[in-house]
Amino acid sequence: MGNAYIVGAVRTPGGKKDGKLKNWHPSDLGALVLDELVERTGAKGEMIDDVIFGCVSQSGAQAGNVARNAVLSSKLPESVPGTSVDRQCGSSQQAIHFAAQAVMSETQDIVIAGGVEVMSQVPIGSNIIDSFKEGHGQPFNGKGMMERYPGVQFSQFAGAEMMAKRWNFSRDDLDSFAFASHSKAI
């Protein structure tokens, strides 16, 4: 099994609601990061085997495989594929794991992983809210889920409470872990 290495990292400035990045199309924002990463690392575009981006709200400007659209908006060759991952808050982290797995399994050599969201254009939850408005139903009331989890109203909050109860995590345990994690990131 091969090894995977992170050889470069690029990000846009942190944005805020209706801030300076609000009018950037998500594909163009992703393309900016792709082009800068290739520039900084000296990689040749044709050497890139894949682009994997996390994106939670894949609707509106972020629909239609935003990772591939970012590739097409970038200077990378059209031959470079791209795929988008939705693992909710862990989407970009999952993209990195998928990239590492591809390299470690030796099925790919160079993979760019990251994520893109322009929440001023596609606010959190808008993909579900818009679906409700259009009468397309909701994602958490399939027969199998309703039978397996009777009376459970699914949300990140309910899920967090269920996991804390099941694994016996106290609020203090979780706060301490979150504080330690945040401290490592700064």
Q: Which residues fall in each region the model found?
A:
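N-terminal amphipathic/basic leader segments beginning at the initiator methionine
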Residues: 1-15
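Short, internal active-site loops enriched in acidic
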Residues: 56-58
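Short glycine/serine/threonine-enriched helix-capping/active-site loop
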Residues: 7, 53, 114
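Short glycine-rich phosphate-binding loop at a beta-alpha junction
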Residues: 47-54
